[in-house]
Amino acid sequence: MVIGVLTLQGGFAEHIAILESLGVEHRRVRVPNDLLGLDGLIIPGGESTVMDKLARAFDLAEPLRAAINNGLPVFATCAGLIYLGTVENPAKGQQTLGCLDVVVRRNAFGRQVDSFDAVVDVEGIDANVAFIRAPEVISCGAGVTVTARVGDHVVGVRQGKIHAYAFHPESAGEVRLHQAWLASI
């Protein structure tokens, strides 16, 4: 099994460290050819608008969209969730992949100073996670399953082979969500 990690910007190093700790072969994804032969893809947190601009600059956005729409399993955190869905009130010129049938509100939990750690039930796993300028899902299409909530906020979803979270398990050293996703591939 070879898992790609989108390494345009953001928190990809923590995801790579988790894959290495689990003994999973991985490849950094920056250009379209890096997608060839992957069994799954991790889209990390970071800044969704920068991720979008860089993916377009490297001619990666359309191949990413095609690979995901053709069934490539995806594990996404924070900005990765935003990049997969549709954004409520997007930044000027911001584009997303639109592969996940959700509408996302950016920075739903406040600014950087409002970041917090929490234990969140994700389909029976009490996951230790970090919320850092975290988004929330404000609407889901019929094919989307809600997998995690914090109060009234939807913070985890699954659609087919896409598992997406508003939070950062990797920042808290939480590996069980990665393990569950890898086992589902």
UniProtKB/Swiss-Prot annotation:
<dbReference type="InterPro" id="IPR002161">
    <property type="entry name" value="PdxT/SNO"/>
</dbReference>
<comment type="subunit">
    <text>In the presence of PdxS, forms a dodecamer of heterodimers. Only shows activity in the heterodimer.</text>
</comment>
<dbReference type="InterPro" id="IPR021196">
    <property type="entry name" value="PdxT/SNO_CS"/>
</dbReference>
<keyword id="KW-0456">Lyase</keyword>
<dbReference type="GO" id="GO:1903600">
    <property type="term" value="C:glutaminase complex"/>
</dbReference>
<feature type="binding site">
    <location>
        <begin position="132"/>
        <end position="133"/>
    </location>
    <ligand>
        <name>L-glutamine</name>
    </ligand>
</feature>
<dbReference type="InterPro" id="IPR029062">
    <property type="entry name" value="Class_I_gatase-like"/>
</dbReference>
<dbReference type="GO" id="GO:0005829">
    <property type="term" value="C:cytosol"/>
</dbReference>
<keyword id="KW-0315">Glutamine amidotransferase</keyword>
<keyword id="KW-0378">Hydrolase</keyword>
<feature type="active site" description="Nucleophile">
    <location>
        <position position="78"/>
    </location>
</feature>
<comment type="pathway">
    <text>Cofactor biosynthesis; pyridoxal 5'-phosphate biosynthesis.</text>
</comment>
<dbReference type="GO" id="GO:0004359">
    <property type="term" value="F:glutaminase activity"/>
</dbReference>
<feature type="active site" description="Charge relay system">
    <location>
        <position position="170"/>
    </location>
</feature>
<dbReference type="GO" id="GO:0036381">
    <property type="term" value="F:pyridoxal 5'-phosphate synthase (glutamine hydrolysing) activity"/>
</dbReference>
<feature type="binding site">
    <location>
        <begin position="46"/>
        <end position="48"/>
    </location>
    <ligand>
        <name>L-glutamine</name>
    </ligand>
</feature>
<feature type="binding site">
    <location>
        <position position="106"/>
    </location>
    <ligand>
        <name>L-glutamine</name>
    </ligand>
</feature>
<protein>
    <recommendedName>
        <fullName>Pyridoxal 5'-phosphate synthase subunit PdxT</fullName>
        <ecNumber>4.3.3.6</ecNumber>
        <ecNumber>3.5.1.2</ecNumber>
    </recommendedName>
</protein>
<dbReference type="GO" id="GO:0042823">
    <property type="term" value="P:pyridoxal phosphate biosynthetic process"/>
</dbReference>
<dbReference type="GO" id="GO:0006543">
    <property type="term" value="P:glutamine catabolic process"/>
</dbReference>
<comment type="similarity">
    <text>Belongs to the glutaminase PdxT/SNO family.</text>
</comment>
<feature type="active site" description="Charge relay system">
    <location>
        <position position="168"/>
    </location>
</feature>
<comment type="function">
    <text>Catalyzes the hydrolysis of glutamine to glutamate and ammonia as part of the biosynthesis of pyridoxal 5'-phosphate. The resulting ammonia molecule is channeled to the active site of PdxS.</text>
</comment>
<dbReference type="GO" id="GO:0008614">
    <property type="term" value="P:pyridoxine metabolic process"/>
</dbReference>
<dbReference type="Pfam" id="PF01174">
    <property type="entry name" value="SNO"/>
</dbReference>
<keyword id="KW-0663">Pyridoxal phosphate</keyword>
